[in-house]
C-alpha cells in the first residue's frame, strides 16, 4: 500500500526523534508472528520504556541517518521491526530475546549500542547488561563482603592477641 509523502516524512521524523533519544537499538524480523503476540510485545516494550515500530527499510535508513544507529543500515532488509531503548540500554534486547524464545518465527537481526554493531549472535551482551538498580546491588554486595571479611580478620587478630596475653 502506498504511503503519502507527508506520512513518510512524519514517520521518518518520529523514528529519527526516537533514535536521537535512544541508548541502544535492536532490529528484528517479525514475519509470521500473530497480532496478539505482537500486541503483547508492544505492551511489554512500552512498560519498559522501549519504542517499537515496524518501518519500511528506506524510511528506516533515512530516519537513522546521522545518528549512532546508522551502522544498522545493512540490517534493514526484509520486514523490519525496530526497537529503541530509552531508559536502559539492554531493555529492548532483553525483551526481544525473551519474546523470541516463545516465537519460532521471530528473528533478531542485529543491534547497536554506543556506535557498535552487534550481530544477532552477540545480542546476549546487550541483553545481560544489569539495570542501574542491579548494578548498585552488585556493588553493595561486593562492598559488604569486603567489610565483613575485614571485620572477621580484625576479630581473629584480637582473639589471637588476647590468647597470647593470657
Curated annotation (Swiss-Prot):
GO biological process terms on file: translation
Source organism superkingdom: Bacteria
GO molecular function, one term: structural constituent of ribosome
A Pfam family recorded for this sequence: Ribosomal_L10
Keywords for this protein: Ribonucleoprotein, Ribosomal protein, RNA-binding, rRNA-binding
Gene Ontology CC entries for this record: large ribosomal subunit
InterPro entries noted in UniProt: Ribosomal_uL10, Ribosomal_uL10-like_sf, Ribosomal_uL10_bac, Ribosomal_uL10_bac_type, Ribosomal_uL10_CS_bac
Gene3D superfamilies cross-referenced by the UniProt entry: 3.30.70.1730, 6.10.250.2350
SUPFAM superfamilies xrefs: Ribosomal protein L10-like
Family: Belongs to the universal ribosomal protein uL10 family.
Job of this protein: Forms part of the ribosomal stalk, playing a central role in the interaction of the ribosome with GTP-bound translation factors.
Subunit structure: Part of the ribosomal stalk of the 50S ribosomal subunit. The N-terminus interacts with L11 and the large rRNA to form the base of the stalk. The C-terminus forms an elongated spine to which L12 dimers bind in a sequential fashion forming a multimeric L10(L12)X complex.
Protein name: Large ribosomal subunit protein uL10
Amino acid at each position: 500500500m502506498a504511503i503519502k509523502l507527508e506520512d513518510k516524512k512524519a514517520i521518518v521524523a518520529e523514528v529519527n526523534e526516537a533514535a536521537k533519544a535512544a541508548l541502544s537499538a535492536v532490529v528484528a524480523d517479525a514475519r509470521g508472528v500473530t497480532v496478539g503476540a505482537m500486541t503483547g510485545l508492544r505492551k511489554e516494550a512500552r512498560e519498559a520504556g522501549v519504542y517499537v515500530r515496524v518501518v519500511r527499510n528506506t524510511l528506516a535508513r533515512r530516519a537513522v541517518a546521522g545518528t549512532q544507529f546508522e551502522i544498522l543500515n545493512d540490517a534493514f532488509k526484509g520486514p523490519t521491526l525496530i526497537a529503541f531503548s530509552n531508559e536502559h540500554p539492554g531493555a529492548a534486547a532483553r525483551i526481544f530475546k525473551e519474546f523470541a524464545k516463545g516465537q519460532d518465527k521471530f528473528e533478531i537481526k542485529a543491534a547497536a549500542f554506543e556506535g557498535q554493531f552487534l550481530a544477532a549472535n552477540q545480542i546476549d551482551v546487550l541483553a545481560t547488561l544489569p539495570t542501574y538498580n542491579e548494578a548498585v546491588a552488585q556493588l553493595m554486595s561486593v562492598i559488604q563482603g569486603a567489610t565483613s571479611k575485614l571485620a572477621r580478620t580484625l576479630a581473629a587478630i584480637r582473639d589471637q592477641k588476647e590468647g597470647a596475653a593470657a
